[in-house]
Amino acid sequence: EDGIRDSVASRGRGDVYKRQVASVLRGFSAPVVLTQDLSDADRAHLLAHDTDPFNRWEQGRMLAYGSLLGMIREGKAPNKDWLAGIRAVIGDETLDPAYRALMLGLPSQSDLARALSEAGDTPDPDIIYAATEATRAAMADAFADLLPTLYRRHTVDAPFEPNAKQAGKRALSNAALSLLTRNDDGVLAQEQYDAADNMTQQLSALANLVRAGRGNKAVEAFEAQWKADRLVMDKWFGLQVMEAD
């Protein structure tokens, strides 16, 4: 009966009162733009642990923007909280492969330039490019122990089928390949190109070979194979422009 007649009484475990991070708009379906004053640590916590997939993606997007803009403006290193949060997401095999592939993406250089302009800063394309490349290199190093497993586990060995399951697995394995190529000089990309039974896998491998500086033969072989298909050749031209230094 102790405390029952008190006007105010408290009961519970001490750890319940630790500081909490709110997952605002969880499960909300309307297109709401919410401004939150969250620390990088809070955003990284939500990125790693939130049960709402959109909220996780949004916190990852905000952290990626903040990290890249800090690198561009002040020469900072990539945000370690963001890298740790992304690591938690891509290593979670309960999550959809396509979703994890999306989480490995970065804001485009044009979006970064727009964000700088809107903030009153003058975008420098060379600095934006360097920050983006440094971030991808940091991701390749931070996830080095996870990437080979992700690539092998989600490489599709079955005959090509245009379904969501295979597309998601291909997206994740190709996202992993893009980072792995930064540390293996394109060896794995060459293996994928040689073994590919569809254009998607070929094109992904080709882009990585070009990035690694060893794509000349593959570029010629791809042209010879697909030169009659105008849409595919548009992709062929595009990747060479995008990967050009």
Question: Where would I find each of the regions flagged by the language model?
Answer:
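Short, small-residue-biased leader/transition segments that mark boundaries at the very start
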Residues: D2-Y17
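Long, ordered, helix-rich scaffold segments
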Residues: K18-D245
